[in-house]
């Protein structure tokens, strides 16, 4: 199973992402053959197959592998090394390769027991995005506890906090909307095509300063403190790409700075470590959190 094409492509991407300075053709081919051998699947990697695989990394995975003639090596395009798509591909592949070493799901791998996350819609939505076709579906609104019919132009699939969303806009509208896949039902692709000037760069820019999926707030400088334990968690798994996390002078906690939109999702993230978090600035955020905690105390006494 490991010797199929998609596995070879992902092995190459993994090798190049771990060796950003680049690898020679010989090094890549030997590493691929070694990977197969470890899985008891001997594979004789031919030069022609290698050349085809390098080309197919771009065609099938949308990633550019550059040949550096001066140093006689191959590298991932520098613009894509930190791409979250690469991380998604490789993380999925690492789980996959661990699983195929066993006949079926081994007992020592324990997945989280949670309800469906809507991934059954993933391929349908992805195909509609590629074909630029409208989608129509029923959507459950949490705030009003009702189902509404939605018709959208789908532009992208975006992951946030272990949930997937389809990003798009309504017909004759240009403002971006996000719809959780886990709240979608009766999904159908319509025959109607759409045109748009919105691209992935536009969408990435739209969410650049936000945490999770809420947007449309102004960007502010936020300073917070955590104790040592929570600070280490936040340091290892940053809240936002703008995060700067520094150990305080006493080495008893962390000072964290962010440049971010203060949205409901961000506030909920701060509340998830309520026993430790201390907001330094802005003052309105400090007061807002204090009010939430005061109201919670009233409800729970």
Q: What are these model-derived regions, one by one?
A:
Residues 1-88, 295-301:
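Short, basic/aromatic recognition patches that contact phosphate-bearing ligands
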Residues 4, 109-223:
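Core beta-strand-centered patch of the WYL/Sm-like small regulatory domain
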Residues 7-15, 92-95, 269-272:
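Short, hydrophobic/amphipathic alpha-helical patches that form generic packing surfaces
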Residues 25, 62, 66-141:
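Bulky hydrophobic/aromatic content
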Residues 66, 158-159, 246-248:
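Well-ordered beta-strand positions
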Residues 69-71, 161, 181, 251, ...:
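Residue-level signal for tight coil/turn positions that link beta-strands
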Residues 73-75, 136, 165-167, 255, ...:
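General beta-strand recognition
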Residues 208-301:
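Polybasic (Lys/Arg-rich)
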């Amino acid at each position: 199973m490991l010797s199929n094409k998609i596995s070879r492509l992902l092995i190459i991407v993994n090798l190049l992402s771990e060796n950003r300075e680049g690898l020679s053709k010989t090094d890549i081919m030997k590493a691929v053959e070694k990977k197969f051998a470890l899985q008891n699947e001997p594979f004789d990697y031919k030069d022609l197959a290698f050349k085809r695989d390098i080309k197919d990394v771009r065609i099938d995975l949308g990633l550019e592998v550059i040949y550096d003639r001066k140093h006689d090596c191959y590298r991932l395009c520098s613009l894509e090394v930190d791409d979250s798509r690469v991380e998604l591909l490789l993380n999925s592949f690492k789980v996959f390769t661990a699983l195929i070493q066993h006949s079926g799901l081994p007992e020592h791998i324990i997945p989280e027991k949670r309800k469906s996350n809507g991934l059954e819609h993933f391929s349908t939505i992805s195909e509609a995005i590629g074909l630029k076709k409208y989608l129509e579906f029923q959507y459950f609104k949490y705030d009003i506890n009702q189902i509404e019919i939605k018709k959208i132009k789908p532009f992208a699939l975006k992951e946030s906090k272990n949930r997937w969303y389809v990003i798009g806009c309504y017909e004759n509208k240009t403002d971006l909307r996000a719809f959780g896949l886990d709240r979608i039902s009766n999904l159908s692709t319509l025959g109607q095509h759409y045109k748009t000037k919105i691209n992935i760069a536009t969408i990435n820019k739209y969410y650049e300063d936000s945490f999770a999926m809420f947007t449309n707030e102004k960007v502010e400088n936020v300073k917070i403190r955590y104790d040592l334990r929570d600070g280490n968690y936040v340091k290892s798994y940053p809240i936002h790409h703008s995060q700067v996390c520094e150990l305080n002078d006493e080495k008893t906690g962390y000072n964290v700075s962010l440049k971010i939109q203060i949205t409901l999702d961000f506030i909920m993230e701060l509340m998830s470590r309520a026993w430790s978090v201390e907001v330094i600035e802005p003052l309105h955020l400090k007061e807002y959190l204090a009010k939430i905690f005061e109201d919670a105390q009233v409800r729970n006494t």
